[in-house]
Amino acid sequence: MNSVARFKRVYVEITSSCNLHCSFCQETLRKPHFMSVDEFRTVIERIGHYTNYIYLHVKGEPLLHPQLGEILKICQDADMTVNLTTNATLIKEKLPVLLEYPVHQINVSLHSADDNDCIDMDSYIHNLFESCETLLDKTETEISLRLWNTKKEPFLFGEKICTIKRHLYINVQSPFEWPDVNSTYCNERGFCQGLRQHMAILCDGTVVPCCLDGNGVMALGNILDSTLEEILSSPRSVAFMEGFKKKTAVEPLCMHCSFKERFAHKM
């Protein structure tokens, strides 16, 4: 593997399916799909010279994937550092896999459980913390418990990361809105790290510049059909990167994305 990685991270969505329906999560317009093990292997082979750090998440619940163990083994064999974002409803069921193929970090979206009445919170919390204790005891996996600092019930200590114990954290974040070309917000001025520090690959192989493009609106190509070099050198990819060099969004979805305001200091 190349010692110098071009991207700090690449998001790889192994499934677009989810077992919850959260109000804050943008509706997925794509059909439910699971990336096959062979397809995932191809993805890893084709991004290997560009990064050694992947997030198994864009949309969907990665612990739903029936071949999760095989996927994590491919990552392990390729010396990939893996982050995994989950609602943790299946963490007890998938614990043997997570113990056999430990990941670098598991991000638990606690606000997902709070947003779904179908979840028995007592059972959820018990299974989550029991699984966390096992992982912390038997692996080097770091666990980040994420909460959103909402306007309705704000945390007094604001937005920050608090260490509970070694490798276990509470991460309080501000909510964000998924970009939508039909939203009232529109501003072509701004900055984004898409295709500079990160990019995303959807479960059908579609490459997009950013993990907030959950519906593949800015499809740059398909990594199962083309090399990443070919995709990144395409006219659309080049225009995207050149635009943000000038602090200008050229894609309609980016114009309607307020998340780029978080990088205003780079203007």
Give each language-model segment a name.
Residues H65-L195:
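Conserved AdoMet/S-adenosylmethionine-binding subsite of the radical SAM
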Residues C18, C22-C25, C192, C210-C211, ...:
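Short cysteine clusters
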Residues I201-L202:
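Short, acidic, Ser/Thr-enriched surface-loop or helix-capping motifs
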Residues V12, S16-N19, C186, T248-E251:
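Processing junctions and N-termini across compartments
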Residues V58, G194-R196, M218, T227:
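A conserved catalytic-core signature of glycosyltransferases
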Residues M1-Q105, D117-I119, A264-M267:
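Conserved alpha-helical substructure of the radical SAM core
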Residues M1-K8, L212-M267:
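Flexible mid-to-C-terminal extensions adjoining Fe-S/redox cofactors in radical SAM and related proteins
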